[in-house]
């Protein structure tokens, strides 16, 4: 820990930060245990880095909810994606490694909310992370779950995730499959070509 403050001081902020009831450990130990599982599995460096950094922004996003009677960490995945990018750039990791890890940190919460995991949502996720990365994201989820210190990932739930990913990969969707395109949107909105048209297309795609 004494050396850590000179390398990744952001990790130290998790020491003593109590989490919600789903976790036995504070943020610091949870990150280390998540990393340890990735190492035990001998998974590649980008998964290990994602594991140790995945909850890097929980300390600054922690709030206490009187309604839930527990802590919440809303947005820690989005903030963490940016923070992990800053850390890896500072440590001079390659652009490819930086992009991949920050992406995994950004999307690591997807498989934690089973009620929102639909086939359409999985397809959109694959579009966001790339089909070559989706299985690594599931591996990161496994590490995260083990790192909580609670019961291991329930087999039926993991099988459900895997089945949905396999189905989505066999029947992928893309912007090209929408029944509209940039030209039609420009005709209707009278907008000129530019980022706004892309935003509209992606917003429509998210509703598929």
Describe each PLM feature range.
Residues 2-4, 44, 94, 191-192:
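Short coil/loop linkers at secondary-structure junctions
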Residues 3-6, 109-110, 186-191:
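Core structural elements
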Residues 86, 90, 145-208:
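Charged substrate- and nucleic-acid-binding regions of tRNA-handling and nucleotidyl-transfer enzymes
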């Amino acid at each position: 820990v004494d050396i850590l403050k000179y390398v990744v001081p952001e990790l130290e902020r998790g020491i003593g930060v109590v989490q919600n009831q789903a976790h036995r450990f504070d943020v610091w130990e949870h990150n280390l245990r998540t990393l340890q599982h990735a190492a035990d599995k001998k998974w590649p460096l980008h998964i290990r880095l994602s594991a140790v950094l995945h909850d890097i922004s929980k300390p600054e996003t922690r709030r206490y909810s009187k309604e839930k009677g527990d802590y919440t960490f809303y947005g820690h995945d989005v903030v963490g994606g940016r923070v992990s990018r800053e850390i890896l750039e500072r440590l001079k990791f390659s652009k490819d490694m930086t992009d991949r890890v920050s992406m995994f940190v950004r999307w690591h919460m997807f498989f934690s909310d089973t009620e929102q995991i639909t086939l359409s949502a999985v397809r959109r996720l694959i579009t966001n992370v790339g089909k070559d990365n989706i299985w690594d994201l599931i591996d990161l989820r496994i590490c995260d779950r083990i790192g909580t210190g609670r019961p291991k990932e329930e087999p039926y739930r993991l099988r459900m995730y895997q089945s949905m990913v396999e189905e989505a990969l066999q029947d992928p969707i893309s912007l090209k499959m929408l029944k509209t395109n940039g030209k039609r949107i420009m005709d209707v909105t009278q907008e000129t070509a530019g980022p706004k048209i892309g935003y509209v297309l992606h917003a429509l795609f998210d509703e598929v």
